[in-house]
């Protein structure tokens, strides 16, 4: 009977060792699981383990979280408590087995009974020794984890963090708004400073013109109260510019109609004769001596002597050339803007009303003087444009003298004849053939645009008509 008893004792010892190892493994798994939950949730308030031989984790709602906080803290602080909690069950089982063995083997010796009593007493001593150790561990857990003792701390800590985050967010928003306001102010100040210096040159730009005719017209409009001397000086300059443009235009367009040439000559003569008209805007005592002398000479009739009147016009042209500065003389032969300004000036109704009627009767005399400068008669002169050679390329002019109050008409033929009536009663026009001249004289006439001065004083040969 001894081997059977030995086997039973060894099997009971092995069962106790296996149970101890299994419980130890379960405790390690529980500790790892709780560490993971603490890392994710922050605390173990919602975790609860079920009762039984094999405990299972269970998560509680937030309402029951505060009630289970203390229990969870105790369980975490005493991981060995569960191990010894299961020992009483095993002890009862062991006692039952030992009682059965005693009842079955009542005939055993007293030595075996004493050994069983010693084993039972050893289990009781182990229980008594572990009770004070459990109380010590509970005190230490309370000191180490004060958050677990207070039910309000788990709720207040996340709320405090949220409030701090919200405060930092509001501070960043206010800082951003302040920076945006400052940048907007700097932009507006910079824009205002950039606009202020540009206002001056922009207002003065309309007064700047490249062409001298436009510059004179703009100054006349912007300065209505200018001195009379400057105004008369601008009038003389305008007349000279028109005279040069007319001569250049005649050279560039040899096939121009006689009606347009007569209109151009009339405008030139009107510009010369209107110089005294501008003197009404100021006191009569400030009129220059040259303009006054010219007005006195123009009021005289053609009966006083054609040579004297022609010399007066030539003298006036020289005076204008001497008084005109070089900067005001146009370099281009026929500037378009100058002609546009001059034509607008001639068509102005105010200037026409200011001019006296006596000067309008003297405009044909000025044209007569222009024809006498070339040594021609007062009759209509027609230069034949059908001739070949350099004469046709340089000058092909038709000069007519329309009657007063009648607009010239453009009726010309290619063979060099004209049907316009003359000023003295539709006289028969004489055709004067152009004599060949030297190429040097023709080239100088075309380049300088002053053909009247080049041919002045040269004899003209006329042939009888027919």
Curated annotation (Swiss-Prot):
SS bond partners: none
PROSITE patterns: IQ
Keyword Hydrolase included in the entry's annotation: no
Feature: compositional bias, Basic and acidic residues: 132-153, 297-306
Biased composition (Polar residues): 282-293
Record's keyword annotation contains Phosphoprotein: yes
PTM-bearing positions, type Phosphoserine: 438
Domain IQ: start-end pairs: 6-35
Top-level taxon of origin: Eukaryota
Organism annotation: Homo sapiens (Human)
Annotated spans, Disordered: 105-157, 214-233, 238-310, 394-466
Protein name from the UniProt record: IQ domain-containing protein C
Keywords: Phosphoprotein
């Amino acid at each position: 009977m001894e081997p059977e008893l030995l086997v039973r004792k060894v099997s009971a010892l092995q069962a106790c060792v296996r149970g101890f190892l299994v419980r130890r493994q379960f405790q390690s798994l529980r500790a790892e699981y709780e560490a993971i939950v603490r890392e994710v949730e922050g605390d173990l308030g919602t975790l609860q383990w079920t009762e039984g031989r094999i405990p299972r984790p269970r998560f509680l709602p937030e309402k029951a979280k505060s009630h289970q906080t203390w229990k969870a803290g105790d369980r975490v602080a005493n991981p060995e408590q569960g191990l010894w909690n299961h020992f009483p069950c095993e002890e009862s089982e062991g006692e039952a087995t030992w009682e059965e063995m005693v009842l079955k083997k009542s005939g055993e010796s007293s030595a075996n009974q004493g050994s069983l009593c010693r084993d039972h007493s050893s289990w009781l001593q182990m229980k008594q020794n572990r009770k004070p150790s459990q109380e010590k561990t509970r005190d230490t857990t309370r000191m180490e984890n004060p958050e677990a003792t207070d039910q309000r701390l788990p709720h207040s800590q996340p709320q405090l963090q949220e409030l701090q985050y919200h405060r930092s967010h509001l501070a960043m928003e206010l800082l951003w708004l302040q920076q945006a306001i400052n940048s907007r102010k700097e932009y507006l100040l910079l824009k205002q400073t950039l606009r202020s210096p540009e206002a001056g040159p922009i207002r003065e730009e309309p007064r700047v013109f490249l062409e001298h005719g436009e510059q004179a017209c703009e100054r006349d409009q912007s300065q209505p109260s200018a001195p009379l001397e400057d105004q008369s000086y601008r009038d003389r300059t305008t007349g000279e510019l028109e005279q040069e443009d007319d001569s250049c235009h005649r050279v560039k367009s040899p096939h121009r109609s006689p009606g347009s040439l007569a209109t151009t000559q009339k405008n030139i003569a009107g510009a010369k004769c209107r110089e005294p008209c501008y003197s009404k805007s100021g006191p009569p005592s400030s009129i220059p001596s040259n303009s006054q002398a010219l007005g006195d000479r123009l009021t005289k009739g053609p009966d006083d002597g054609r040579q004297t009147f022609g010399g007066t016009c030539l003298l006036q042209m020289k005076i204008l050339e001497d008084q005109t500065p070089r900067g005001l003389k146009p370099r281009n032969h026929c500037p378009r803007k100058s002609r546009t300004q001059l034509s607008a000036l001639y068509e102005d109704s105010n200037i026409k009303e200011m001019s006296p009627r006596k000067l309008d009767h003297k405009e044909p005399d000025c044209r007569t003087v222009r024809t006498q400068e070339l040594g021609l008669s007062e009759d209509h002169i027609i230069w034949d444009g059908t001739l070949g050679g350099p004469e046709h390329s340089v000058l092909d002019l038709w000069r007519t003298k329309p009657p007063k109050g009648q607009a010239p008409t453009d009726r010309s033929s290619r063979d060099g004849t004209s049907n316009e009536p003359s000023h003295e009663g539709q006289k028969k026009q004489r055709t004067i053939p152009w004599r060949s001249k030297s190429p040097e004289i023709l080239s100088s006439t075309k380049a300088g645009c002053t053909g009247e001065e080049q041919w002045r004083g040269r004899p003209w040969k006329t042939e009888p008509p027919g």
